[in-house]
């Protein structure tokens, strides 16, 4: 046996105090983590104030998140800036038609507006057509235009062409033109086997100058005297494509004229002249013979041919071009007489700009049509209706302005037809909508800053939640005043799908009719950007935090059990129990600090994403939840420190070391965490001589004295400490006189 330096051990009173503090801290940690995890599982305060994070959408960029709503909000927001306008006036009127067939076409018209100013002006001007117009007439004309779009492969091109065509027709009607060129052209195209080709031919003829058109007069006269216009066209085509010398032409015409004057036979003359004609000019010679054989007036035909050759039309490039276009018209038509008559009338039109617009418009409409015959039939009916109804004509320019300002003219027009039909049957319900349009027209379009400022009030009026409080198991909605509106039933861990969160809130609000009318689903919400790209980082965070919180709860519970065990004397100085308790304290601390860190990182990721994407959404951490988790970590950290301190002091003071001495009766006295062992088990190991026995007793007294003095140093009433006396008393061990000097540094090592 030998004596070493001995550190003053902690008394049981201090150990119990430390264990009590640790038990209290672990119990508090357990409660804090449970409350933080449960969060707003019950819809009452103060639990509703416990949430992981809160999304604030009062200044959400609606035009970016829901692009279809952007133009609508711009128009309605502009109306709100008008004098004496209020949310009830604007959105109350919209709410009145929410359950009617009018909401869908109205919102579609506004949503498709690429230029809200033009759209508002056009709708305002078209409104009387719906309210006070002739339902049968105005609706029929709109239906006819809608029919054109039905057969269109390119609605934009069709409407552009129709706009040119109708504008030109209206101009012609206002000038009282004696020749309705549009009607002539439509008749030509309806008779054509290839309307597209015929339209191109008419454009070619229309682009000729008046002098170039005059060159065609001999051609028209030849057709006028012809008994077989197909043969006449063939003969003229041959003349246009064959080179004939002027001398030969003059000789031929002179001989023919003499024959006619003398009453001779033209056939004999042609037979006589045939051998004299060069081979290259033979086709032209045969063409002249064909023309004279298929005419009602030989003299007039021969005179016309003479004029045609004298003007050298067969060599004129413009004449060749014009004749080629005329040939196309004849070939595509089953009524060559109508073709000649119509082309001759169109050639007399002096306003080529107007006629060009008509033909270009027709070309656009026909080229974009999937059914040319139906398209031409509808155009004829529309032309007839507009020319006979002056009351509808005044609305045509605004109609095409509306379509021109639309991103989807086809849908816009069909919506206008539907809305007009409904408004004519329900004028009183529709009048407040017209007031909204009038208010919007009377003021400047609302700016982005003004719209952003009034967004909170609009959202509040439509009962759309402003604040979204995310807990682990629940999601709560709050209004502009931070009052809880509702909390969903606790369910599986929140997956932080912001698209679904926002859409579900919209569906349960007064905004639902707008979503249904525009057929907007959750996938239509535009939330692309950094926030969604990092979804794989923050979505698993909530599940991780839940797992860590559960571990913290479990570890806290078992830590409390081991702390209670350490209260008992038989376990107080068992080093393995202290090490297990220490490990559990560390686990609680690690679980809570990781949960707190993960939430902080998740909040930072979401805040960064919403800021960079410029959605106007502000996300911040829940102060109550953050405080609970960090407090739980702080308590577990302090408790861990206390356990480490106590364990280390006990270890350094030898409390965990097994030691023994033999008393006068040969019995073993044990201390530390050793067990009492009978003296006879030691046999030869017992101290046999008196010197050794005296030495052992002295050592035992020193050990007892050291512990006694330690207890006296840590307790104010040494004599009253029954626990210490119980610990130190042992049979046949005589305490050392306390009046003498005490060696507090003596330590026995077996």
Curated annotation (Swiss-Prot):
PANTHER family, A to Z: CELL MEMBRANE PROTEIN YLR413W-RELATED (PTHR28019:SF2)
Compartment(s) where it occurs, according to its Swiss-Prot or TrEMBL record: Mitochondrion
Ligase listed as a keyword: no
SUPFAM superfamilies on file: ARM repeat
PTM text: N-glycosylated.
Key word Ubl conjugation present: yes
Location of region: Disordered: 703-750
GO biological process: fungal-type cell wall organization; long-chain fatty acid transport
Polar residues biased stretches: 703-726, 736-750
GO CC terms, sorted: cell cortex of cell tip; cell periphery; mitochondrion; plasma membrane
Record's keyword terms, sorted: Glycoprotein, Isopeptide bond, Mitochondrion, Phosphoprotein, Ubl conjugation
Post-translational modification Phosphoserine, affected residues: 675, 678
Name of the protein described by the UniProt record: Uncharacterized protein YKL187C
Site of covalent link Glycyl lysine isopeptide (Lys-Gly) (interchain with G-Cter in ubiquitin): 697
Glycosylation sites noted in the Swiss-Prot or TrEMBL record: 61, 84, 115, 154, 176, 197, 207, 228, 241, 267, 293, 299, 312, 335, 351, 373, 389, 519, 709, 714, 724
